[in-house]
Amino acid sequence: MEQPRRYGDRFTAHTAVVTGAASGIGAATAERLAQEGAAVVLADIDQERGTAVAERIGGEGGRARFVTADVSTEEGWERIAAAARDFGPVDVLVSNAYTVDVAPAHETSLDSWQRQLAVNLTGAFLGFKAVLDDLRARRGAVVLTSSVHAHKGIPGHPAYAASKGALLSLCGQLAVEYGPEVRVNAVLPGPILTAAWDRVSAEDRARSVAETAAGRFGTPEEVAAAIAFLGSHEATYITGASLLVDGGWSVVKSSA
């Protein structure tokens, strides 16, 4: 069996919470933090896949626990925080959970709009509040998963883009209000090859690749590496920042 890659021990004796951890960037981040020594609480609404990720981490010698939770509710965060206490105070919070409905603004229902903002934005706000005492005591770090579409619109994604833009405002606000005790940063992924691309036509996939300077899709593991850096002691003078992980997509779009 292939052995898991080892990256170091930046998170030894640390506890991390990762939401949206059943797949994609969230799963890759949970695995990366565990590989670097963290005890990780994974949260998602997908119990089957989330449990599988936690079991995979455990099988590789890591410490992980999965919690089924809706991050848009206080009850969901009570469940997550309780699970984290079994490991210890939270040092790193990665708010990565999101949902998206594809429709132009005039066809987006109020229910759809509110649900997307509840998960994508309110979930990050509630998570910060739920573990703030731990973060303050541990001088911890928060990483919010935004998107390149916080800056540049994408047809059919009004609520998604609005929520991702609002996350950047929340990032700056929390960094100012809770520094120097807590650092808060955001990553802005570009075209990352996750399961969401399975629903996209080959033509549109090729167009997205052509719009990157790197000439390819990114991987969830590459975003996880950026998140791990921002959550680590190597980034102690970085807060309120927005880190693009987009293969140069933003530069190409700006010059077009």
Model-predicted regions and their roles:
Residues 2-7, 152, 228, 239-256:
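Short C-terminal tail/terminal secondary-structure segment
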Residues 104-105, 109-117, 197, 208:
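Substrate-binding pocket helix/loop in short-chain dehydrogenase/reductase
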Residues 106, 152-158, 215, 233:
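Active-site loop immediately N-terminal to the catalytic Tyr-X3-Lys motif
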Residues 128, 163, 171:
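Active-site helix of classical SDR
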Residues 147:
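Residue(s) in the substrate-gating loop at a strand-loop-helix junction
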